A protein has these predicted regions:
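A conserved helix-loop-beta module that forms one wall/lid of the active-site cleft
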Residues: 1-61
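ATP-dependent carboxylate activation and anion-phosphoryl transfer catalytic cores
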Residues: 8, 17, 21, 44-47, ...
Length: 253
């Protein structure tokens, strides 16, 4: 439902949901002025990830490492006011990012379609990172946490259909949730091919009233092969473009 999208994108509502579910997320804050952004960043500690609220494709997202960088970002990249807040989050150094696609029906059943491990480190936009399914380096205990949290978030948001959730795992194995997108994501075609199930078709059926049992999709598929997705980057067409990958999406496929 539309309210699920708002709950996932509105920082105050999202933080309240995660606290209610006892799910970890990186320390963060909401800033409606330059002064508030500086206070939030110094309370959290640099480096921080900054971005506008309600954004797609990582537009205007940046990792900043000092007050000077943050002031430059606010002056040149975004317009900050009470109606257009900026989100300030702790950047997790040396973390591994994971994408999870899951399917939910109206009866509250949730099945994970795939857990993808990013090859590039967390901080590179998920659309620019290569990834593998299944995960290759994440511990079973961290994966168990992801498998526990994913249905909790999907049910709490009231999702019927597909949901994408992004996680980060730091070197000691602690899992943090980065964001949830209560919709079909760009990874759905890749996961569907990897596991051999037409996820978009399944999502259409459950949105029309079918249950996961009706379509015989009731448990996570265990793969005996590895599938890899690589991004298509257009730097040969744009020779002047900065080739350093970051939180703002660069790939075209």
């Amino acid at each position: 439902p539309p309210d699920s999208i708002d709950a996932a994108e509105d920082r105050e509502r999202w933080q309240a949901i995660l606290e209610e579910l006892d799910i970890l997320q990186p320390p963060g804050g909401v800033a409606r002025s330059e002064a508030e952004a500086l206070v939030a960043a110094n309370n959290i500690g640099y480096p921080v990830m900054v971005r506008p609220s309600f954004v797609l494709g990582g537009r205007a997202m940046e990792i900043v490492s000092s007050d000077a960088d943050l002031k430059r970002y606010i002056t040149t990249a975004v317009e900050v006011d009470p109606e257009k807040p900026v989100l300030v989050d702790k950047y997790l150094n040396n973390a591994t990012e994971l994408d999870v696609d899951a399917l939910c029906d109206a009866e509250g059943n949730v099945v994970i379609a795939g857990i993808m491990e990013h090859i590039e480190q967390a901080g590179v936009h998920s659309g620019d990172s290569a990834c593998s399914i299944p995960s290759q380096t994440i511990s079973e205990s961290s994966l168990a946490t992801i498998r526990e949290w994913t249905p909790k978030v999907a049910k709490r948001l009231g999702v019927i259909g597909l949901i994408n959730i992004q996680y980060a795992v730091i070197p000691d194995g602690t899992v943090y949730i980065i964001e949830a997108n209560p919709r079909a994501s760009r990874t759905v075609p890749f996961v569907a091919k990897a596991i051999g199930h037409p996820l978009a078709k399944y999502a259409s059926l459950v949105m029309a009233g079918a249950t996961l049992a009706d379509i015989n999709f009731t448990e996570e598929v265990k793969l005996n092969h590895v599938a890899v997705k690589e991004a298509v980057l257009p730097f040969d067409k744009f020779p002047g473009a900065d080739t350093l990958l970051g939180p703002e999406m660069r790939s075209t496929g």
